[in-house]
């Protein structure tokens, strides 16, 4: 089996995006916070599937 490394790029967190648009306070009023807080960590990587990669 082969290991493929996917480069990750840090994206804007949901918390930061909501704050920039002035929506964080409203979001906090109606949202429950899960035990695992992932609002401040967003990483993305491009994945290609198939031959040729698409």
From Swiss-Prot:
GO MF term set: aspartic-type endopeptidase activity
InterPro entries assigned: Aspartic_peptidase_N (IPR012848), Peptidase_aspartic_dom_sf (IPR021109)
Oxidoreductase keyword on record: no
GO BP annotation list: digestion; proteolysis
EC numbers on record: 3.4.23.4
Propeptide residue intervals: 1-27
Catalysed reaction, written as an equation: Broad specificity similar to that of pepsin A. Clots milk by cleavage of a single 104-Ser-Phe-|-Met-Ala-107 bond in kappa-chain of casein
Record family assignment: Belongs to the peptidase A1 family.
Function of the molecule: Chymosin is synthesized in the mucosa of the stomach. The enzyme hydrolyzes casein to paracasein.
Subunit details: Monomer.
Protein's name in the database: Chymosin
Species assigned in the record: Felis catus
């Amino acid at each position: 089996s082969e290991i493929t490394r996917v480069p990750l790029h840090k994206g804007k967190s949901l918390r930061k995006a909501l704050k920039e648009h002035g929506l964080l306070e409203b979001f906090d009023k109606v949202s429950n916070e899960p035990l695992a807080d992932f609002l401040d960590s967003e990483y993305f990587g491009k994945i290609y599937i198939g031959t040729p990669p698409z």
